[in-house]
Amino acid sequence: MVTGISEENDDEETFSAVHSSTPSINSQSYAIPITEEMSSSFHDSISTTSNSSGSFDSDGSNVSDVVEQNEMDNESNVDEDLFLDNDIPQSSNLLPTDAQDPGPIFDVSRYIFDSLKQSIDSADFSEALSLQTKTSAVINSKSLELKQYIDEMKSRLTQLQEKFENGEATSKKIKRDLETSRKNIDYLNAALRVDFPIEFNQAREKILERRLNEDHDC
């Protein structure tokens, strides 16, 4: 009896050492915890196996079998964790399947480039270039003609300004001469009317008759 109790104590110490070398329960997210009932039943099975064998060697082999069984259980728990991790979808993949695709982004620069390319290809570029050259030549020639006309008008305007200034001076001189002549005529009329009244009146009548005849002929 004492030998059986000591062997059972040795088995418990060996199981405790083996159990302490296994990975922690907390590191396994989905591992099933070992309760006290499971531990007691496990101890009973070990004691029953050791009593039936009747030798220490057979007990050692049973303990090694138990250690291997625990390692297999741990591996199965790890496989189960991997299966659960693969089975649970990631948060990045939890997008709704009916979400609409925004589609490709509109490339403005590409659109402009394609439009210009089509316009160049559709038109005769050489003809357009020649037409542009002719138009530039016509514009340049007309610009030169306009410049010549402007220069001529400037010179002509200068001449007219000089003539106008000269004509203004001449008209002022003529006006002064006319005023002087009018004064002289008035002076002579006054003198003749006083000194020669009969001759003055006869001459005046002749002048008036001549004017009347000219008006009648017209």
Curated annotation (Swiss-Prot):
| Positions of region (Disordered) | 1-65
Q: Where is this motif: KxDL?
A: 175-179
Alphabetized InterPro entries for the sequence: BLOC-1_subunit_KXD1, KxDL_dom
Please list the residue ranges that the record marks as compositionally biased, kind Low complexity.
39-65
What are the Polar residues biased-composition ranges?
17-30
Q: Where is the signal peptide?
A: none
Stated name of the protein? Biogenesis of lysosome-related organelles complex 1 subunit KXD1
Protein encoded by which gene = KXD1
